[in-house]
Amino acid sequence: TEAKMWDLMEYDIPVAREIQDRFNCQTDSKFTKVLAGGYMPTHIDPGRTAVVMFSLTDNPSPIIYFDGQKKLFTHQYKCATIINAKIHHGVPVNTSDRIAFQVNLYLTWDEACKMHQKGTLYDSHI
């Protein structure tokens, strides 16, 4: 099995930029795709601390968090989800194409959680 994955970091999609611009912190964004039969290796993200994931495909394979080789928990995306990118995570089994729009956050995890709880992380007003 191979990774079969890619990132699209340069794009001109106005609605994606509008979503990214509504975050009240430093962000950048990208689209990711992992093909069916591929996988996303277990990793800790090197720069970003948190990621807001917008799944663009139905029933994406779940993300799994690890402590060494031990599974901590499995999360099935059903809506936009913020993840802690500094905990080992991956998608070891990908049964269908998995496409997502990701907004990368560079706050500490605690700062991101506090802003989310206060309703200040994202400006939802049009």
Region spans (language model):
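Short beta-strand-to-loop capping motifs
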Residues: 56, 103-107
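Ligand-binding loop in jelly-roll beta-barrel domains
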Residues: 86-101
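Catalytic core of non-heme Fe(II) oxygenases with the double-stranded beta-helix
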Residues: 17-85, 99
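Active-site or metal-binding loop neighborhoods of secreted/extracellular toxin and effector enzymes
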Residues: 96, 106-126
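Alpha-helical and His/Cys-centered functional microenvironments
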Residues: 47, 93, 106
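Non-heme Fe(II)/2-oxoglutarate
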Residues: 1-24
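Short, charged, solvent-exposed linker or helix-capping segments at domain edges/interfaces
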Residues: 11, 64-66, 112-117
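Short catalytic/ligand-binding loop motif for oxyanion handling, primarily in non-cytosolic enzymes
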Residues: 38-42, 89-92, 109-114
